[in-house]
Amino acid sequence: MSHPDLLAPPDTRPIEVGEVWENPVTLESAVTVDLPWLNDEGRAAGIMTAVPGARVVGEHMHPALVERFSVEDGELTVLLDGRKSVLGAGERAEIQPGVWHDWWNEGDKTAIVRVEVTPGERFGHLIETLFGLAREGHVNKRGMPHPLQLALLATEFSDIIVFRKPPPAVQRPLFGILAPLARRRGYRATYPSLSRTTLAPRVPRDTPAG
């Protein structure tokens, strides 16, 4: 697991409704249906397809955002604050800031789930980075980046996500030690060739996407 090419040209295509974002390692796929600059709440939303065996990269919590799952078809197993439940079609879960959670599809049918995140812009930047690293082969079989990459990513997005392992009390000093080494070895928190969310033009509200 090396790092992406730092000399690769940036991807500055506009981010639009209807895009498909895929992670070939965690088997997540989502179609964007709302973008933070298109609504007053700053919400990002997508329709996620989770095939059997799909799962998020690991148990985590969001310090300052709300995440909502609405199952449209199939079933999604959710671990919410240590309690496991299975959401079926028509059922929802709302995850408040600071609540540890995880999800996966342990059934034999593809799950279709609407996912909403508020506020969503920096969350989108994180997801585009993680998915891009996965597509280029820079993650392990669980979808987690190299520890040097993770040190920079977790520090940059500490307001968005905190992974449960290693424990947060260990992460802070550990990542503080690893971050300078990671930069010297060419790692960056994000990469313009993978993450358009900070550079791409915004499609105005009154301009049809696509």
Show which residues each predicted segment covers.
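Short, well-ordered beta-strand segments enriched in hydrophobic/aromatic residues
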Residues: A44-A50
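Jelly-roll (double-stranded beta-helix
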Residues: M1-E28, L35-R43, A54-E59, P63-L65, ...
